[in-house]
Amino acid sequence: MPLGGGLKSVPNGLNPPSIKLVKWNDVFGVEITEKEINRVTAVAEETMAEVIIGIGGGKTLDTAKAVGHHRNIPIIVVPTTASTDAPCSALSIVYKENGKYSHALWYPKNPDVVLVDLDIIIKAPIRFLIAGMGDALATYFEARANQESDSLNYVNYEDGGYKRSQAAMALAELSYKILLEDGLKAKVAAENGVCTTALENVIEANTLLSGLGFENAATAGAHSIANGLTALPENHKTLHGEKVAFGVICQLVIENRPTEELHRVIDFCLSVGLPITLEELQVEATLENIRIIAEESMAYTWSSEPFSVTSNMVYDAIFATDKYVHHYKKSMFT
């Protein structure tokens, strides 16, 4: 039973004549909410679906995972973009009707099958690939924060999680290295509709490496900022990974990491076109908005940082990040 959202038709490999498909391309809405999950789950129940196939972007795939979990049926995900690390993860991010972050649903297992077709991915708007780099960019820095705080990961999360492995840290770091080395090359290739080794590497980093990395090492400040941004309606037009990229810089600022590292991340974001100021995220840089983001972000994973974080610290970090990036960009042309 395919859950549409990314393709006009089901790929031939998923549509053999011996299998009856019940398509609901027009059923899934724009937002993944509890109401939407329950509605689509009802469709799966009514049609006695034996398999759920999610074809589309991150929210479509997260919905498919939720439906498959509720119905206890196998889950196949077919991402049509490389915009997030959702395809491989054992969770779904649920939002409220107004687009604000609500909560996460945690599952005992990952999707049964993840099919990534490069011919499909490279046809997606370039913005999605870039946003995926923003999401993957956070994996290493958040893993490092969790390592320094000795926090538990997201494996079997509802029972408390486990200590991260060295393999998880290696995957997270590899994801970051691939972005720095191949990110810009991948963007140029995708813009011109060709598939290169660099593009393949970045798609792997965005989906597999980042997905395994964040689940097995957990998130921290960057995703807290991203979720805090969803409290502002004007920011809802931006993609998850775009929010996360700004969150990465805020996290580095609040951690007071070396200037060289901060500049390396800013330079990468600028090179691929990730938004890294509030204005670029369609948010007016008012003190009130910054306060809202900071306070909303406290409900998430700042506790994974290696020190106690307060909303005032986050407020200062957001303000400083926005001003610093503006200053840095101006200095490039003087």
Predicted region positions:
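ATP/NTP phosphate-donor binding region
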Residues: 1-51, 278
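Short glycine/serine/threonine-rich phosphate/pyrophosphate-binding segments
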Residues: 6-9, 34, 59-66, 84-88, ...
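A short, small-residue-rich loop immediately preceding and capping a beta-strand
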Residues: 44-80
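A glycine/threonine-rich phosphate-anchoring loop and its flanking beta-alpha core
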Residues: 69-167
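Short alpha-helical scaffolding segments that buttress acidic/His motifs in well-ordered protein cores
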Residues: 137, 141, 199-210, 248, ...
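Active-site segments that bind and position negatively charged phosphate/pyrophosphate groups
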Residues: 156-267
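C-terminal charged capping/lid subdomain of soluble metabolic enzymes
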Residues: 257-334
